[in-house]
């Protein structure tokens, strides 16, 4: 038996075991650890096959070496994290396959395990078509640098969506000021919690995270076909994400004007503008209905028109590769994938990003109308005077 035959035989066996575990739908961490171990081995075989020059085997396309390598490394990370979680007090809770997926793990707050997500729909400028959806997780499981696991409860307030860490500090992973900065013209933000609408004190402005104010929100309840504002005292509850529309060219604070790109994301045309609720399968699933519409305001007269992409780094690399091959005639420059870091350290913040530049707004809008966006990737407009 040749080496090629042995590899293919091994690959078939591994893929059969992977399918068996998917069908088992176990809640045992040991099964999920085994699954990620199999995924690592599968990608190792794909890597070797591509290294030996095989583009297709048995009618199947062989992934690029960089893709297989990245997938294998991520599988190792997941296996190590799950083995550590299995040794923690939270192993006995029971973990579904969905709760240990790559999408759930990378959803904000990134590289944590999360349970019981609820959708929180944000509405900007009191416009029922200017919506986005984010996720509030009831429970967030994270590990410290000293390898200690903690279970944190999620919550929501006037500042944004957060979880409370083991030192009783609110760790925000969605900030309403940042959302409004990119998708609102007036700074008005309203979000739905169950059957009530909560009006964030307006206008929302960019503030330092250390100066968070605790306030009781105003609760808005719909009456008839129109939503009327009734002031009540209510304690926010946990939710998660949905759909949004952005505004371009709005006035922002000097601090906001210094930013080169926005953090919110979008994908494709949104569906119904009605508020809905329910557990989200993936964190930060966002549809940005107005991204493909030309919004009000004064567009920049000079410089470069940008489209930014945000999401899991591996998915971004695949998307960037596709754009490079398919839209090279439209895109002027295509940046590499990167992540933001804290200004006073090296800790990564949020998901990966990359930008592509267009010579004029017409080409950018044409691109946005034609491009297909994966479910776990979001897009946003940006502008730069120089590149």
Swiss-Prot record:
Residues 1-205 are annotated as: Transactivation domain. It comes from Human papillomavirus type 41. Belongs to the papillomaviridae E2 protein family. Phosphorylated. Sumoylation plays a regulatory role in E2 transcriptional activity. The lineage of its organism: Viruses, Monodnaviria, Shotokuvirae, Cossaviricota, Papovaviricetes. Residues 303-387 are annotated as: DNA-binding domain. Pfam families: PPV_E2_C (PF00511), PPV_E2_N (PF00508). The keyword Repressor applies. Plays a role in the initiation of viral DNA replication. A dimer of E2 interacts with a dimer of E1 in order to improve specificity of E1 DNA binding activity. Once the complex recognizes and binds DNA at specific sites, the E2 dimer is removed from DNA. E2 also regulates viral transcription through binding to the E2RE response element (5'-ACCNNNNNNGGT-3') present in multiple copies in the regulatory regions of the viral genome. Activates or represses transcription depending on E2RE's position with regards to proximal promoter elements including the TATA-box. This is Regulatory protein E2.
């Amino acid at each position: 038996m040749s080496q090629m035959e042995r590899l293919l035989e091994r690959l078939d066996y591994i893929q059969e075991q992977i399918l068996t575990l998917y069908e088992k739908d176990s809640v045992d961490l040991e099964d999920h650890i085994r699954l990620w171990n199999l995924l690592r081995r599968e990608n190792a075989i794909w890597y070797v096959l591509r290294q030996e020059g095989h583009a297709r085997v048995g009618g199947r396309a062989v992934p690029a070496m960089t893709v297989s390598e990245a997938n294998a490394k991520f599988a190792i990370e997941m296996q190590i994290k799950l083995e550590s979680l299995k040794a923690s007090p939270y192993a006995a809770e029971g973990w579904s396959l969905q709760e240990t997926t790559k999408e759930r793990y990378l959803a904000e707050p990134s590289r944590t395990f999360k349970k019981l997500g609820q959708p929180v729909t944000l509405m900007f400028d009191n416009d029922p078509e200017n919506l986005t959806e984010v996720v509030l997780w009831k429970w967030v499981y994270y590990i410290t640098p000293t390898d200690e696991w903690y279970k944190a409860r999620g919550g929501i307030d006037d500042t944004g969506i957060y979880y409370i860490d083991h030192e009783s500090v609110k760790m925000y992973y969605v900030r309403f000021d940042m959302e409004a900065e990119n998708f609102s013209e007036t700074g008005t933000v309203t979000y739905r919690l169950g059957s009530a609408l909560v009006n964030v004190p307006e206008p929302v402005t960019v503030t330092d995270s250390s100066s968070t104010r605790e306030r009781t929100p105003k609760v808005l309840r719909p009456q008839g076909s129109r939503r009327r504002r009734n002031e009540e005292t209510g304690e926010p509850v946990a939710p998660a994400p949905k759909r949004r529309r952005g505004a371009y060219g709005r006035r922002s604070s000097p601090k906001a004007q210094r930013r080169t790109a926005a953090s919110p994301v979008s994908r494709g045309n949104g569906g119904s503008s009605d508020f809905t609720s329910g557990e989200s399968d993936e964190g930060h699933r966002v549809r940005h209905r107005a991204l493909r519409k030309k919004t009000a305001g004064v567009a920049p007269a000079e410089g470069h028109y940008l489209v930014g992409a945000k999401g899991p780094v591996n998915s971004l690399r695949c998307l960037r590769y596709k754009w490079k091959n398919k839209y090279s005639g439209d895109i002027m420059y295509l940046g590499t994938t990167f992540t933001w870091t804290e200004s006073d350290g090296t800790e990564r913040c949020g998901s990966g990003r990359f930008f592509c530049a267009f010579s004029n707004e017409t080409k950018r809008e044409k691109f946005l109308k034609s491009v297909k966006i994966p479910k776990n990737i979001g897009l946003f407009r940006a502008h730069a005077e120089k590149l």
